[in-house]
Amino acid sequence: MLPIPEELTTLISDLELYLADGLKGENLSKKAKEKREAFIKRIKEVKLSFPQDFKDKYAEDSEEEEDWDSNEGGSLQSERTDKDEEACEGAQQAPAVAAQDLTSVFKAGYLEKRRKDHSFFGTEWQKRWCALSGQTFYYYGSEKDKQQKGEFNIEGYRVKMNSSLRKDSKKDFCFEISATDKRSYMFCASSVKEAEEWVKQIDFVLKDMTGIIPEEEEEGQELYDDVGQMDEIYEVLPEEDMPSPPPKVEPVSKHPPPTPAVDKSTDYANYYQGLWDCMGDLPDELSFKRGDAIYILSREYQTFGWWVGEKNGQIGIVPKDYLMELYAL
């Protein structure tokens, strides 16, 4: 007997996957459910009739069938797909870490991740909870997962917006993390602004790794150049037109009036709480844990992403992106 073409066995397996997995969460009528079960049963009978052609695929489907009986939407199957993709790329698997245990998180939230390979009936984009922790990009099924579905180190990568990844209304929400001779990762955010924030944070970490001067210092350099231009203007002016310097005023030897005290018990707008654990690297940085209440004393370093906060009598600078408002006003 001639073997069944591989294209046909793949199509039958994909059809079974769609009937058993893709339609599992749909609100089907009683008649449609009966038809669905009948088709699944018939496909299994066909596979049993040609064991030499469906040997490997049938073994995989048997394992997946057990997962479908106890999981919604075949989440274990998608997790296996993610791990298989990582293994195929030769990526080094990091130890399992729960989403809530990540530290030094620069950016986190839900994204749609594009699968490297997907079947005819499979989903090309999968919803994932993603987090940039230090130099590692993690992705989970949800923010409550105890183990990541995959991760990769962003060293050597570059990030950019890419509207060619999709053809629908979300095409402008997409960005790509790629590198030469490495696997590319494609994601879709909920909006253009959210995608741009992801690109900005990832690019910031990449620049920090390569020692490129941050934007704030570049702006300072531009300000220095402006001062040089002002000097040139003053040199052109005639000397007689130069205004005379103001008379020197001797400082008054008395203390300035005290700043009115703020009642912290009612100053709810300046109370924040930690989103994640944060351990200070320097003596002037304030350490805190997720859920700790922090009172903000000053926002004068906001341009650099830092505030001055107080916790249990200790004062130090805190990263503002690690905080959220404690009270809803």
Swiss-Prot record:
<dbReference type="InterPro" id="IPR037781">
    <property type="entry name" value="SKAP_fam"/>
</dbReference>
<dbReference type="Pfam" id="PF00018">
    <property type="entry name" value="SH3_1"/>
</dbReference>
<keyword id="KW-0075">B-cell activation</keyword>
<comment type="function">
    <text>May be involved in B-cell and macrophage adhesion processes. May play a role in src signaling pathway.</text>
</comment>
<dbReference type="InterPro" id="IPR036028">
    <property type="entry name" value="SH3-like_dom_sf"/>
</dbReference>
<dbReference type="InterPro" id="IPR001452">
    <property type="entry name" value="SH3_domain"/>
</dbReference>
<feature type="domain" description="SH3">
    <location>
        <begin position="267"/>
        <end position="328"/>
    </location>
</feature>
<keyword id="KW-0728">SH3 domain</keyword>
<protein>
    <recommendedName>
        <fullName>Src kinase-associated phosphoprotein 2</fullName>
    </recommendedName>
</protein>
<dbReference type="GO" id="GO:0042113">
    <property type="term" value="P:B cell activation"/>
</dbReference>
<comment type="similarity">
    <text>Belongs to the SKAP family.</text>
</comment>
<dbReference type="InterPro" id="IPR011993">
    <property type="entry name" value="PH-like_dom_sf"/>
</dbReference>
<dbReference type="GO" id="GO:0005886">
    <property type="term" value="C:plasma membrane"/>
</dbReference>
<feature type="region of interest" description="Disordered">
    <location>
        <begin position="240"/>
        <end position="263"/>
    </location>
</feature>
<dbReference type="GO" id="GO:0005737">
    <property type="term" value="C:cytoplasm"/>
</dbReference>
<keyword id="KW-0963">Cytoplasm</keyword>
<feature type="region of interest" description="Disordered">
    <location>
        <begin position="58"/>
        <end position="95"/>
    </location>
</feature>
<keyword id="KW-0597">Phosphoprotein</keyword>
<dbReference type="InterPro" id="IPR001849">
    <property type="entry name" value="PH_domain"/>
</dbReference>
<feature type="domain" description="PH">
    <location>
        <begin position="104"/>
        <end position="207"/>
    </location>
</feature>
<feature type="compositionally biased region" description="Pro residues">
    <location>
        <begin position="243"/>
        <end position="260"/>
    </location>
</feature>
<feature type="compositionally biased region" description="Acidic residues">
    <location>
        <begin position="61"/>
        <end position="70"/>
    </location>
</feature>
<dbReference type="Pfam" id="PF00169">
    <property type="entry name" value="PH"/>
</dbReference>
